[in-house]
C-alpha cells in the first residue's frame, strides 16, 4: 500500500506531477527548437567534412567580392567580374572535363505584363562533364539531365552584398573546385550570373545560352536577409528535395533547415521577394507558354534572418549574422544537396509531385507527399461523439468507475416492494434535476468553447493594442511579443477551464478528474476534426502543404481521446475482477474461521466487535458491523490530506497531445518571427503579422487545455505577471536599434527639359537658362518616415510633399527640392567641347542625349545614349491617357524576337522598356510599334512619355582604380547626406534600379 501511495504521488494525475511534466515538456521543446536553430560549428582542420574545401580561401574570396557595392551598372561590377574570371580560369586550367565560358554574347528581350526588357548578359559559365554523359553530344531538351547551380555576383547599389549574394558565389567557387576534382555522374553547369538584382536579368540571359538546354534540375543559392542558417526557401516538388538523402552518409547535410511554409508564402504573395527560381522553373511565364508546365525541377536555398539589414550598408562581411559559420553552413548544404542532385537514386522512377517538408528539431528533414497527407485526412476517423459531463463531476461521492469500488447491485431486503421503490427512485431523480444542475452541466459542456472564444477575443484585442500603440515593437523583439501573446493565451484558457472544473471536495474521487479531462479532450477532438476538414479542403484545392501540423495535431488528440474513452471501461473491468477475487478470499476466510467463532466466549465476542475487522466486506459480513466499518473508513479517508490520482493513463495522453504540436508549431513560429517581423518596412501589414503571432501562440497553448484543471494555480499568477510586465515594456520601448534599423528607400530624380536632351545644333550643346528640377525622394513606413526627415539638412527649409507609394503598398514617399545637392553622372561628356566639367555648372551638365523619329503611322525609332551609364529606359503614357498601347519593340543589334514564354501583352501593351548594355555609353536604337484601342480611328491617340537614364555610383562606394580624375568621379551628394546624417537606427536602401534617374518628356509627332 505504501508503494502504491508513493507511486501515485509521483505518477498519479495530481497537480504537482501534471504541472512538472507539462512544464518540462515545454522547456525541452522550446530548447530543442532554439538549439536546432543555431548555426553548426565549423569542422576542425583535417575533418573529412572539410576535405576538398578551403575556408580561408573562401573568406578571402568573399572579402574581394563584397568589398563595396557592385551593381550591374557600376565599374565595381566589372572589377568583381574580372576577379571571378581569374579564379575560374585557375580552377579550370589543365582539366579537360572542365569548360569555362566567358559569356559576352547572350542578348535577349523579354517582357512581363507591365514592362519589357532588353539585356546584354555578362554571365560566367562553367560546365563540368559528368561520368555518365558524353561531353561531345548536344542533348536535346527533352532528355536533358544536367544540374544547374546558380548564384549572382551583382549586388544592389546600397549594399556590398555579403549575403546577397556574395556567399552564394563563394559557395559556387568552392563547389566548382570540389566537383572538378571529384567528378559526379551527371553534368554540372554553373551560372555565376550578373543582373539578378535588376529583376532576374542574368537568369533570363542564361536561357539564351546553349548550355541551358542541358539542364533539367537546378539549385539556386540566394540571400534574402543578412546571414544565419540558410533555409530551403521553396521547391518545385519532393523529387529534388530527396537530394538531401541521396548522398553518402559522410556527405549528408547534418543540420538541414527546411519548411514548406516558405513555399506556400511565396506562392500566395506573402513574401515580397523574387529570385532566379521563378525564371529557371518558368512559373512567371505568361501567354500561351504559361500552360506548358515547369521548365526545370529545382530548389531555392537562401538566408532569411535579419531582413532589416538586407540591401543596406550592413550587408557586409563584418556584419553578417554568424560570420564564417554562416558561410560554412551554406557550403555544407550546397555540397550535400549538390551531390544528391548529381547522383540521384532511381531518378527515372521518381515522380514530380508536390509535398510537405520540414526539419524536425535536431533530426534530419522529413518528407511527406501532399497526396499522402490528403489521403490520410480524407480517411481520418469520423467526428468524435458528443461529449458528456459525467455524473461524478456533480456528485463527488459517486463511486462508479473508481478503482476498487464495488459494482454489485444492492441486495433487496425481505418483503420490499420493487415497483414502489422504482417509482420513488424515478420521482427522486426527477426532483433532483434542478435548474442549478442543468446550468452546471451546460457550463461544463460549453467551458472549452467559452475558453476558446475568450482566448481568441483577448488575443485579437492584444493584437489591436500592439498595432495601435507600438506596431514596430515586434521588429526588434519578436520573441518578447510571442511571450506576451503566449502568457495571455495560457492565462485566459487555464482560468476559464479551472473555473469550470474546480477542485473536487473529495480529493480521492479519481474518476472525477479523469472524466473531466476526457470531456475537454472530446471537445478538443471536435475542434481538431473541424480544422482537419478545412485543411483537407485547402490541400485538395490549393496544394497548401503548411497544414501538416493540423494532421499531426489531430492524430495526437484522436489517440488521447481513445485512451480517455477506454480508460473507464478497462478500469471498471479491472475493479470488478479485483472485487470478485476479494469476495472469494472473504468467503474462504469466513468458512475457515466459523468453528473458532462459534466456540468463542461472550467476552471474546465483545472484544472482537470493538476492534475493526481487517477482512474485506462480503455478503456474509454482518450488516451492522459493515456499516460501522464503512463509516470508519470514510472518516479516515476524508481525514487524508494527500491528493489521489490515476497512474499512467494521463501521462500517455500528455505525451501524445503536447510534445508533437509544441515542437512543430514552435519551429514554425520561430521561422515566421525571424522571416516576417522585419517586413513592416517593406509595406507588409502589421495586422497580419500580429494576428499570425497570436494564432501561433494560441496553438501552442491548446494542447494543454485538457490538463489545465490540474495545473498549479501559481502558473496562472505567473502568466498574468509575465503578460502585464512584457506587454507594458513592449508598448513603451523604442522599436529600432542599430542591429535592427528602420529601413528607408532613396532615389533622386532629375527632370530635364526637351532642349537639354534632344539635339538642337551641330555640336549638340544645348544650354538652358533655368536648369533641371532636382527632387530627393525618401520612401518608408509613414509611422516613422516623417520623424526621419528632419535629420536631413536639405529637407529642413523646403516644402515637403508626401503621398502613398505607387507600387509598394503600405509605404509613403516624401519629396522635396534639392538642387543644391545635384548629382553628377561622372565620366567624360561625349557631346561637350568643354575640356573639363569643372568649368561647367550643375545646370548645364549633360546626362544623356536622345532622338525620336516617326518611321510610320504607328511606328517610331528611339535613339538613346547615356553618359557613364549602362542603363536607360523608355516610359510610355498609359493607354487611358495617350490613346495608344505599345505592342512590339526591337533593339538593333540584339536577338530577334521575344524570349519564349515572355511575350508582350497585346491587350495592355508595355508601359516601360528597360535597356541594359554590357558596354559603357552605348547608344541604343529601339524600334517601337503601337496600336490604337479598338473603336478608335487611326488618327486618334499620340505616343508620349519620358526617356530616362539611371546611375548608381557615388563617391563613398567608388572603386579607387584611377579610372576617373577628381573632376569626373560620379557623385550623389543627397545619398551621401542620408548616409551621414540619418541616425544609427535608420538604414538606407535603394528605391529602384537607379539611385538617380534623369528624364525628359517626349511626344511622337
Swiss-Prot record:
Residues 36-353, 470-479, 541-543, 666-686, 735-1005 are vacuolar. GO terms for biological process: proteolysis. It is a multi-pass membrane protein. It is found in: Vacuole membrane. Residues 406-419 have a biased composition (Polar residues). Its EC number is 3.4.-.-. Its main location: membrane. Residues 379-420, 577-640 are annotated as: Disordered. The chain crosses the membrane at residues 15-35, 354-374, 449-469, 480-500, 520-540, 544-564, 645-665, 687-707, 714-734. Zn(2+) 1 binds at residues 152, 164, 222. Residues 1-14, 375-448, 501-519, 565-644, 708-713 are cytoplasmic. Zn(2+) 2 binds at residues 164, 197, 311. Keywords: Glycoprotein, Hydrolase, Membrane, Metal-binding, Metalloprotease, Protease, Transmembrane, Transmembrane helix, Vacuole, Zinc. The record marks 310 as: Transition state stabilizer. Glycans are attached at residues 107, 213, 677, 761, 961. Its cofactor is Zn(2+). Residues 588-606 have a biased composition (Low complexity). GO terms for cellular component: vacuolar membrane. Belongs to the peptidase M28 family. May be involved in vacuolar sorting and osmoregulation. This is Vacuolar membrane protease. It comes from Coprinopsis cinerea (strain Okayama-7 / 130 / ATCC MYA-4618 / FGSC 9003) (Inky cap fungus).
